[in-house]
Amino acid sequence: MKKITTGVLILAIAIVVLIFQYINGDGPFKKSSTDVRGESYLVKRVIDGDTIIIDKDGQDERVRLIGVDTPETVKPNTPVQPYGKAASNFTKKHLTNQRVRLEYDREPKDKYGRTLAYVWLGDEMFNVKLAKEGLARAKFYPPNDKYRILIEQAQKEAQKKQLNIWER
């Protein structure tokens, strides 16, 4: 009888904790968010295929696109990788001097202090566009994986079509 009472007590505590987390939007119930003001930001510069500089309140802010990894072009001590220039040029062509919206996931910054975001150009997520064009690999660092399935599906389409980095 004592084992049953202890089990019920533990279950009740777990339920209370989960309810508290649900009410506060915390723990497993924490959601990603777009910029709370719904503002768009001017892309001032493209660093490489998956990193941009935006103007946020008059300050430059470095933004790393979540869920994609483009071939390197500017990484110190690393040679320019195949399709790196193509990915950088594609991002420059589509985002430079454009206004974008940012959608954040669970962790807003990476260990280098860059803002982590899904970048929206109109109603299209640019992160997906890079993967769909075969200019980026799907790459996720949990817990930032809200659009994992969508980006991985875009990569599979590019692989099937043998686009760019998936060319044989």
UniProtKB/Swiss-Prot annotation:
Task: Spell out the catalytic residues.
Answer: R64, E72, R114
Question: Keywords for this entry?
Answer: Calcium, Endonuclease, Hydrolase, Nuclease, Secreted, Signal
Predominantly, its location class is secreted
Where does it localize? Secreted
Q: Which domain of life is it from?
A: Bacteria
For this protein, what reaction is catalysed? Endonucleolytic cleavage to nucleoside 3'-phosphates and 3'-phosphooligonucleotide end-products
Q: What class of enzyme is it?
A: hydrolase
Database matches in Pfam families: SNase (PF00565)
Q: Which GO terms describe its molecular function?
A: endonuclease activity, active with either ribo- or deoxyribonucleic acids and producing 3'-phosphomonoesters; nucleic acid binding
EC no. given is 3.1.31.1
What are the GO cellular component annotations? extracellular region
Tell me its family: Belongs to the thermonuclease family.
Tell me, in a sentence or two, what this protein's role is.
Answer: Enzyme that catalyzes the hydrolysis of both DNA and RNA at the 5'-position of the phosphodiester bond.
Looking up PANTHER family in the UniProt record yields: EBNA2 BINDING PROTEIN P100 (PTHR12302), SERINE_THREONINE-PROTEIN KINASE 31 (PTHR12302:SF3)
Entry protein name? Thermonuclease
Identify the species of origin.
Answer: Staphylococcus intermedius
* Designated gene of the protein: nucI
